UniProtKB/Swiss-Prot annotation:
GO terms for biological process: translation. InterPro entries: Ribosomal_uL18_bac-type, Ribosomal_uL18_bac/euk. This is one of the proteins that bind and probably mediate the attachment of the 5S RNA into the large ribosomal subunit, where it forms part of the central protuberance. Transmembrane segments: none annotated. Gene3D superfamilies: 3.30.420.100. Belongs to the universal ribosomal protein uL18 family. The gene is rplR. This is Large ribosomal subunit protein uL18.
Length: 117
């Protein structure tokens, strides 16, 4: 089993458990250059809120879009947008990525901005 298939396997297992809970999910995806965050409805068919380093408004504030500072900016932005829509509680879906570095920075920034998970 290679690295990518192991990550997908972990993500599938976690998503199955989150689906059973029926909770709103904060989903994180990262690439070497960008990081993306989406708040997805409990049924899984609708993206309620999204933020990423691809967005011009966020990317203009950053020197580089693939580091922890960028992840923190995305976490803060997605939390603010979720709170505007009345979403306070979410379940954190790290998509099989290790809870470390950029993923952790995004989660910490979202918590500091007011999201609860």
């Amino acid at each position: 089993m290679d690295k990518k298939s192991a990550r997908i396997r972990r993500a599938t297992r976690a998503r199955r458990k989150l689906k059973e809970l029926g909770a709103t999910r904060l989903v994180v995806h990262r690439t070497p250059r960008h990081i993306y965050a989406q708040v997805i409805a409990p049924n899984g068919s609708e993206v309620l809120v999204a933020a990423s380093t691809v967005e011009k408004a966020i990317a203009e504030q950053l020197k580089y879009t693939g580091n922890k500072d960028a992840a923190a900016a995305v976490g803060k932005a997605v939390a603010e947008r979720a709170l505007e829509k009345g979403i306070k509680d979410v379940s954190f879906d790290r998509s099989g990525f290790q809870y470390h570095g950029r993923v952790q920075a995004l989660a910490d920034a979202a918590r500091e901005a007011g999201l609860q998970f």
